[in-house]
Amino acid sequence: MLLISDEASKFEDLLDEIYTATTNNLPRLAVMGVRALLEQVMILKIGDHGSFGEHLKLFHEAGYVSVIQFDALARILDAGHAVIHRGFAPTKGDLSAVLDVMEGIIAALYVHDQNVKNLKIPERPPRRPEPSKG
Protein backbone atom coordinates (compact mmCIF):
# COMPACT_ATOMS: atom_id res chain seq x y z
CA MET A 1 0.00 0.00 0.00
CA LEU A 2 1.41 3.36 -1.00
CA LEU A 3 1.20 5.84 1.85
CA ILE A 4 1.49 9.35 0.52
CA SER A 5 1.28 11.65 3.54
CA ASP A 6 3.91 12.77 6.02
CA GLU A 7 1.62 11.72 8.86
CA ALA A 8 1.33 8.18 7.49
CA SER A 9 5.12 7.87 7.31
CA LYS A 10 5.09 7.82 11.14
CA PHE A 11 3.66 4.30 11.16
CA GLU A 12 4.94 2.93 7.85
CA ASP A 13 7.64 0.80 9.55
CA LEU A 14 5.03 -0.82 11.80
CA LEU A 15 2.88 -1.52 8.75
CA ASP A 16 5.86 -3.24 7.11
CA GLU A 17 6.37 -5.34 10.26
CA ILE A 18 2.71 -6.37 10.26
CA TYR A 19 3.01 -7.61 6.69
CA THR A 20 6.29 -9.38 7.52
CA ALA A 21 4.56 -11.16 10.41
CA THR A 22 1.69 -12.08 8.09
CA THR A 23 4.03 -13.40 5.39
CA ASN A 24 5.91 -15.47 7.96
CA ASN A 25 2.72 -17.03 9.38
CA LEU A 26 2.88 -15.16 12.70
CA PRO A 27 -0.78 -14.20 13.11
CA ARG A 28 -0.57 -13.31 16.81
CA LEU A 29 2.19 -10.79 16.17
CA ALA A 30 0.33 -9.42 13.16
CA VAL A 31 -2.91 -8.90 15.15
CA MET A 32 -1.01 -7.21 18.00
CA GLY A 33 0.72 -5.02 15.42
CA VAL A 34 -2.58 -4.06 13.80
CA ARG A 35 -3.97 -3.08 17.18
CA ALA A 36 -0.87 -0.95 17.88
CA LEU A 37 -0.98 0.66 14.44
CA LEU A 38 -4.65 1.57 14.72
CA GLU A 39 -4.02 3.18 18.09
CA GLN A 40 -1.14 5.20 16.59
CA VAL A 41 -3.43 6.38 13.78
CA MET A 42 -6.09 7.43 16.28
CA ILE A 43 -3.54 9.31 18.41
CA LEU A 44 -2.24 11.12 15.32
CA LYS A 45 -5.78 12.22 14.48
CA ILE A 46 -7.30 13.02 17.89
CA GLY A 47 -4.39 13.18 20.36
CA ASP A 48 -3.48 10.84 23.21
CA HIS A 49 -6.36 10.24 25.60
CA GLY A 50 -5.07 7.19 27.48
CA SER A 51 -6.91 4.03 26.52
CA PHE A 52 -7.73 2.39 23.20
CA GLY A 53 -11.41 2.48 24.13
CA GLU A 54 -11.33 6.23 24.74
CA HIS A 55 -9.34 6.81 21.55
CA LEU A 56 -11.87 4.78 19.60
CA LYS A 57 -14.82 6.67 21.08
CA LEU A 58 -13.27 10.07 20.29
CA PHE A 59 -12.10 8.91 16.85
CA HIS A 60 -15.69 7.98 16.03
CA GLU A 61 -17.13 11.18 17.51
CA ALA A 62 -14.67 13.22 15.41
CA GLY A 63 -16.15 11.57 12.31
CA TYR A 64 -13.14 9.53 11.21
CA VAL A 65 -15.07 6.24 11.23
CA SER A 66 -18.66 5.12 10.74
CA VAL A 67 -20.69 3.12 13.24
CA ILE A 68 -19.90 -0.06 11.28
CA GLN A 69 -16.16 0.70 11.33
CA PHE A 70 -16.38 1.58 15.03
CA ASP A 71 -17.81 -1.86 15.78
CA ALA A 72 -15.13 -3.56 13.65
CA LEU A 73 -12.36 -1.62 15.40
CA ALA A 74 -13.79 -2.60 18.79
CA ARG A 75 -13.61 -6.26 17.68
CA ILE A 76 -9.98 -5.78 16.60
CA LEU A 77 -9.21 -4.31 20.03
CA ASP A 78 -10.76 -7.38 21.62
CA ALA A 79 -8.79 -9.68 19.30
CA GLY A 80 -5.55 -7.94 20.27
CA HIS A 81 -6.40 -8.25 23.96
CA ALA A 82 -7.36 -11.90 23.50
CA VAL A 83 -4.00 -12.64 21.87
CA ILE A 84 -2.14 -10.98 24.74
CA HIS A 85 -4.26 -12.04 27.71
CA ARG A 86 -6.26 -15.12 26.71
CA GLY A 87 -4.02 -17.09 24.37
CA PHE A 88 -6.13 -16.41 21.27
CA ALA A 89 -4.55 -17.84 18.11
CA PRO A 90 -6.13 -16.09 15.10
CA THR A 91 -6.80 -18.20 12.02
CA LYS A 92 -5.76 -17.03 8.56
CA GLY A 93 -9.35 -15.94 8.04
CA ASP A 94 -9.33 -13.98 11.31
CA LEU A 95 -6.10 -12.25 10.34
CA SER A 96 -7.43 -11.50 6.87
CA ALA A 97 -10.51 -9.82 8.37
CA VAL A 98 -8.36 -7.76 10.75
CA LEU A 99 -6.05 -6.69 7.91
CA ASP A 100 -9.02 -5.78 5.71
CA VAL A 101 -10.39 -3.41 8.35
CA MET A 102 -6.96 -1.88 9.02
CA GLU A 103 -6.30 -1.37 5.31
CA GLY A 104 -9.73 0.17 4.81
CA ILE A 105 -9.18 2.69 7.60
CA ILE A 106 -5.69 3.59 6.38
CA ALA A 107 -6.85 3.87 2.78
CA ALA A 108 -9.78 6.12 3.74
CA LEU A 109 -7.63 8.41 5.88
CA TYR A 110 -4.37 8.54 3.95
CA VAL A 111 -4.77 7.27 0.39
CA HIS A 112 -8.27 7.90 -0.97
CA ASP A 113 -8.56 11.36 0.54
CA GLN A 114 -5.31 12.53 -1.04
CA ASN A 115 -6.03 10.83 -4.36
CA VAL A 116 -9.44 12.50 -4.58
CA LYS A 117 -7.93 15.90 -3.76
CA ASN A 118 -5.52 15.39 -6.68
CA LEU A 119 -8.25 14.69 -9.26
CA LYS A 120 -7.89 16.87 -12.35
CA ILE A 121 -11.55 17.68 -12.88
CA PRO A 122 -12.32 20.12 -15.70
CA GLU A 123 -14.36 23.19 -14.91
CA ARG A 124 -18.08 23.05 -15.68
CA PRO A 125 -19.04 24.96 -18.80
CA PRO A 126 -21.13 28.06 -18.23
CA ARG A 127 -24.86 27.45 -18.32
CA ARG A 128 -26.77 28.72 -21.27
CA PRO A 129 -29.39 31.27 -20.40
CA GLU A 130 -32.90 29.87 -20.27
CA PRO A 131 -35.07 31.06 -23.16
CA SER A 132 -37.66 33.55 -22.04
CA LYS A 133 -41.23 32.32 -21.95
CA GLY A 134 -42.98 35.20 -23.35
What are these regions, as identified by a protein language model?
Residues 29-46:
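Hydrophobic alpha-helical packing segments in soluble, helical-rich domains
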Residues 32, 36, 54, 97-101:
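Amphipathic alpha-helical interaction segments
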Residues 41, 45, 63, 106-113:
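Conserved NTP-handling cores and scaffolds of large molecular machines
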